[in-house]
């Protein structure tokens, strides 16, 4: 989310500043003069009164998920704020969001034309692109087909049901050994530091068919790039909401463009290598699967949209970026919750011991045997809401929602955090309670409750990698719970306060872990 527009602009002269201010004032007055007329029978959107030029940015503050949730209590599930000079509609409430993204999915399937979006994946990103026409739909379908093909790809040995299970299981087992080694040498570990490298390795294996040593510089460069991307996006780009600022120098924007260029170059190099060694009869990873689907499309005379080779680079870029940050953040929060609630950690271990045993590695087929673990994961998604907003949507035409008129090309924020903490949906939403996702006797997941939780978006822009992400989090966590007991480092209080960003992360800290004995009760 790009919700902060406080000045992150490089040095400019006094005359340039005056010209920018005068121009913005003129544009603001023109926009006020040409206000959109409200069709008969519809109401004007409610919301706080904006200040000239900066809009409601001061009221939104540095924790938008909290301030916008508070505003929804005052103005309702559909209201409007102004960020800079751009009107933004904020949607809250499960029924309202489902109405917008599912029942009126075509009306809200767009992406706003934000300046920074043009530089993500050279403006061709599946997730951020403003396009929603035939080419975008074809690329999304191609990406989904490649993911599905890869998810059913056989592992190298019969003990793994698929390639995904093999990649995750091997990396999770290595992570257990790594944490045990670090504990012996250092006495504590940074959960995010080790988890993020492990997840990056899984994504590299899935997308590129290669695994790195945890100290490999190329792998660490990827991790650092992702971290830099998150930091720059979290700080915000004022030009997204005050367009005139895109013509002024900006240090943060230069850094943002550089990060995207470096990552694009990395992916381009690996995809080029895959084209050179591609064998249709030996699909090694998601990149091969994408190339295979592209080749089939080129041979299909009935295909309306042909896929160029550069589209493969773009899709791989998207899949890598999306899967990497989301999964590593989810797993890092998982370990924090294990430490914060030791009685829940022990209950998870007992379920693992009784239902799966300690003599083999948990697998995806064990999911039905581990309902409390599944409920624990759902409650982490809900309680942390580490993805507080979806990527901004945009109205693709003049439309209405809950009786309010929403003009075409209006930027729309979906407040997932509010939905996941809505007291009308959840009993005592501020408490961490995995049992809320189980049936009355605690033996099965309550699927209806699980469907209320929102973290991967909804509708036409829903995350296409959701199933893979959920499976990866499950496997990683199952293997960690089976083998390690996590606890806090003495003298270092556990701080669960989220730090706002594209994904909300906990504060960096050090924890302890101990290998569990196979004879442990």
Swiss-Prot record:
Cofactor(s) needed by this chain: heme
EC code: 1.14.14.1
Catalyzed reactions per annotation: an organic molecule + reduced [NADPH--hemoprotein reductase] + O2 = an alcohol + oxidized [NADPH--hemoprotein reductase] + H2O + H(+)
SUPFAM superfamilies: Cytochrome P450 (SSF48264)
Gene Ontology, cellular component aspect: endoplasmic reticulum membrane
Membrane topology category: Peripheral membrane protein
Disulphide linkage map: none
Annotated residues for binding of heme: 463
Chief location of this protein within or outside the cell: endoplasmic reticulum
Binding locations of substrate: 229
Record InterPro entries: Cyt_P450, Cyt_P450_CS, Cyt_P450_E_grp-I, Cyt_P450_E_grp-I_CYP1, Cyt_P450_sf
Domain of life: Eukaryota
Keyword Iron: yes
Keyword Lipid biosynthesis: no
A GO MF label: heme binding
A Pfam family the protein falls into: p450
GO biological process: cellular response to xenobiotic stimulus; hormone biosynthetic process; progesterone metabolic process
Subcellular location per the Swiss-Prot or TrEMBL entry: Endoplasmic reticulum membrane; Microsome membrane
Keywords (A to Z) from UniProt: Endoplasmic reticulum, Heme, Iron, Membrane, Metal-binding, Microsome, Monooxygenase, Oxidoreductase
PANTHER family recorded: CYTOCHROME P450 1A, STEROID 17-ALPHA-HYDROXYLASE/17,20 LYASE
Family listed: Belongs to the cytochrome P450 family.
Reported function: Cytochromes P450 are a group of heme-thiolate monooxygenases. They oxidize a variety of structurally unrelated compounds, including steroids, fatty acids, and xenobiotics.
Name assigned to this protein: Cytochrome P450 1A1
Species the sequence originates in: Sparus aurata (Gilthead sea bream)
């Amino acid at each position: 989310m790009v919700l902060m527009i406080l000045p992150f602009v490089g040095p400019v002269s006094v005359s340039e500043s005056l010209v920018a201010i005068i121009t913005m004032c003129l544009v603001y007055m023109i926009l006020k003069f040409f206000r959109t007329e409200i069709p008969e029978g519809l109401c004007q959107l409610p919301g706080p009164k904006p200040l000239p030029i900066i809009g409601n940015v001061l009221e939104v503050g540095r924790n938008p998920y909290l301030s916008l949730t508070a505003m929804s209590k005052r103005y309702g599930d559909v209201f409007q704020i102004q960020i800079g000079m751009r009107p933004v509609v904020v949607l809250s409430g499960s029924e309202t969001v489902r109405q917008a993204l599912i029942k009126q999915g075509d009306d809200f399937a767009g992406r706003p034309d934000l300046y920074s979006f043009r530089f993500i994946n050279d403006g061709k990103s599946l997730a951020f692109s403003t396009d929603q026409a035939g080419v975008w739909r074809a690329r999304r379908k191609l990406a989904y087909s490649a993911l599905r093909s890869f998810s059913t790809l056989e592992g190298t040995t019969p003990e793994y049901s698929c390639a995904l299970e093999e990649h995750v299981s091997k990396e999770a087992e290595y992570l257990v050994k790594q944490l045990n080694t670090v504990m012996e040498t250092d006495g504590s570990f940074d959960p995010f530091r080790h988890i993020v490298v492990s997840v990056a390795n899984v994504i590299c294996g899935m997308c590129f068919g290669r695994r790195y040593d945890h100290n490999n510089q190329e792998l660490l460069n990827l991790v650092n790039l992702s971290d830099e991307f998150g930091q720059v996006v979290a700080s915000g780009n004022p030009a997204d909401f005050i367009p005139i600022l895109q013509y002024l120098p900006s240090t943060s924007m230069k850094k943002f463009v550089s990060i995207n260029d470096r990552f694009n170059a990395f992916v381009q190099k690996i995809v080029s290598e895959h084209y050179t060694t591609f064998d249709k009869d030996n699909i090694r990873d998601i990149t091969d699967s994408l190339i295979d689907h592209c080749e089939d499309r080129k041979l299909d005379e009935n295909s309306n949209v042909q896929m160029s080779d550069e589209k493969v680079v773009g899709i791989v870029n998207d899949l890598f970026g999306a899967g990497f940050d989301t999964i590593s953040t989810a797993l890092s929060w998982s370990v924090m919750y294990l430490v914060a609630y030791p009685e829940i950690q022990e209950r998870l271990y007992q379920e693992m011991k009784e239902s799966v045993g300690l003599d083999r590695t948990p697998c995806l087929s064990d999911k039905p045997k581990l309902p409390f673990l599944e409920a624990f994961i759902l409650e982490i998604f809900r309680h942390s809401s580490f993805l507080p907003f979806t990527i901004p949507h945009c109205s693709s035409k003049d439309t209405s929602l809950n009786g309010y008129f929403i003009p075409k090309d209006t930027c729309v924020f979906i407040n997932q955090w509010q939905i996941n903490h809505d007291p009308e949906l959840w009993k005592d939403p501020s408490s961490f309670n995995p049992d809320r996702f189980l049936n009355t006797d605690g033996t099965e997941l309550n699927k209806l409750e699980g469907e209320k939780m929102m973290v991967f978006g909804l509708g036409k822009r829903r995350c296409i990698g959701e199933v893979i992400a959920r499976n990866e989090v499950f496997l990683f966590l199952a293997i960690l719970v089976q083998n390690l007991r996590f606890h806090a480092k003495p003298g270092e209080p556990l701080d669960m306060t989220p730090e706002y960003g594209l994904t909300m992360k906990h504060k960096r800290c050090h924890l302890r872990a101990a290998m569990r004995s196979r004879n442990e009760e």
